[in-house]
């Protein structure tokens, strides 16, 4: 499963996921920050469980990742998902920097894109579905607030299927950062970078690919060539669930201004902004968020199946 030998006291893989990895079945990793910090209870737990079922219906195996009682878990029970949902912001949000300390302290932790990639790679999982990646925050030229997700994408061999970077971020600077570190930004059936709640943005992806098999082939070639690092697959939200650009941009601008006024910074900024945007849009952005996660899970399942077929 993985070249690195890690103690089972630190990393536990559920029987369903273990069986899939052993028998070379397609597996799709899922993060847990979206459960604890991305949505309110009970929609968060319900969505997480439904996303897992969606992946199973596509013929792949879901592997929701989190830290439970100081153990990195790959594949959660429904009870563990509901625990993260109920505890919400009381659960520690864990990125690369925080991971060893939360594990060492025996705490519960919700994994971001970065730490989910790390744990997925330890387990030997190559495909990961999420809502949106982190990126360069607005005003980063003054604050240097840049998500650790981007460096993880530069270094860790996992493909991340998302609806682009979260639209609360500076999308232009995020694309420039990814380019600098050689991270492919693939537009699935699009040349325009999706902007999370919206299908397009003023920015281009680095390449358009129109099928899961093309994406899987690129993964195989990239990693077999010794080109370490992840790939971003930007999958536009389905048209019927996309939000009007002027509506979402007005809500984001107001939320960003409020965050600055209240001094909300660092890893608390994204949960604050997403929650405030949901309030300002009367819950419409939350509905869109849920639907884009389902859409990404379906595409990730197809990519995982194609990758497994090619890589064996």
Swiss-Prot record:
Co-factor note (free text): Binds 1 manganese ion per subunit. Can also use Fe(2+) and Co(2+). The unusual metal binding site is heavily hydrated, coordinated with an aspartate side chain and five water molecules, and likely plays a role in anchoring the PsiMP phosphate.
Variant or mutagenesis effect after changing residue 166 to A: 2900-fold decrease in reaction rate while no change in substrate affinity
Coiled-coil ranges per UniProt: none
UniProt cofactor(s): Mn(2+); Fe(2+); Co(2+)
Residues at which substrate binds: 93, 113, 147-149
Entry's Gene Ontology molecular function annotations: hydrolase activity, acting on glycosyl bonds; identical protein binding; manganese ion binding; pseudouridylate synthase activity
Effect of residue 93 to A: 17-fold decrease in reaction rate while modest decrease in substrate affinity
Keywords for the protein's UniProt record, in alphabetical order: Glycosidase, Hydrolase, Lyase, Manganese, Metal-binding
Family: Belongs to the pseudouridine-5'-phosphate glycosidase family.
EC numbers, comma separated: 4.2.1.70
Known partners and oligomeric status: Homotrimer.
Pfam families the UniProt entry points to: Indigoidine_A
Gene3D superfamilies: Indigoidine synthase domain (3.40.1790.10)
Domain of life (superkingdom): Bacteria
Role: Catalyzes the reversible cleavage of pseudouridine 5'-phosphate (PsiMP) to ribose 5-phosphate and uracil. Functions biologically in the cleavage direction, as part of a pseudouridine degradation pathway.
Regulation of this protein's activity per its record: Inhibited by Zn(2+) and Ni(2+).
Name by which UniProt lists this protein: Pseudouridine-5'-phosphate glycosidase
One GO term describing the cellular component: cytoplasm
Residues given in the record as Mn(2+) binding sites: 145
Active-site residues from the entry: 31, 166
Catalysis: reaction(s): D-ribose 5-phosphate + uracil = psi-UMP + H2O
BP-aspect Gene Ontology terms: nucleobase catabolic process
């Amino acid at each position: 499963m993985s070249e690195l030998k890690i103690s089972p006291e630190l990393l536990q893989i559920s029987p369903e996921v273990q069986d899939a990895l052993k028998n070379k079945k397609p597996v799709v990793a899922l993060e847990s920050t979206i459960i604890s910090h991305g949505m309110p209870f009970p929609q968060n737990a319900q969505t997480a469980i439904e996303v897992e079922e969606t992946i199973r219906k596509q013929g792949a195996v879901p592997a929701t990742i989190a830290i439970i009682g100081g153990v990195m878990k790959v594949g959660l029970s429904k009870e563990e998902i509901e625990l993260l949902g109920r505890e919400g912001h009381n659960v520690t949000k864990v990125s690369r920097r925080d991971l060893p300390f939360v594990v060492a302290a025996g705490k519960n932790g919700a994994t971001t894109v970065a730490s989910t990639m790390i744990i997925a790679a330890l387990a030997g999982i190559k495909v990961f579905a999420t809502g949106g990646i982190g990126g360069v925050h607005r005003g980063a030229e003054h604050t240097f607030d840049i998500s650790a997700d981007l460096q993880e994408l530069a270094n860790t061999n996992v493909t991340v299927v998302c609806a682009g970077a979260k639209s609360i971020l500076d999308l232009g600077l995020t694309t420039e950062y990814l380019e600098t570190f050689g991270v492919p930004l693939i537009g699935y059936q699009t040349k325009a970078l999706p902007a999370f709640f919206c299908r397009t943005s003023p920015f281009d992806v680095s390449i358009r690919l129109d099928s899961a098999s093309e994406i899987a082939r690129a993964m195989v070639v990239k990693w077999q060539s010794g080109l370490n690092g992840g790939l971003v697959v930007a999958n536009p939200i389905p048209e019927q669930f996309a939000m009007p650009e002027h509506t979402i941009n007005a809500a984001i601008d107001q939320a960003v201004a409020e965050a600055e006024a209240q001094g909300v910074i660092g890893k608390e900024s994204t949960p604050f902004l997403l929650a405030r945007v949901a309030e300002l849009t009367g819950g419409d952005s939350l509905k869109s968020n849920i639907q884009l996660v389902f859409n990404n899970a379906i595409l990730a399942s197809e990519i995982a199946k194609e990758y497994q077929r090619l890589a064996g």
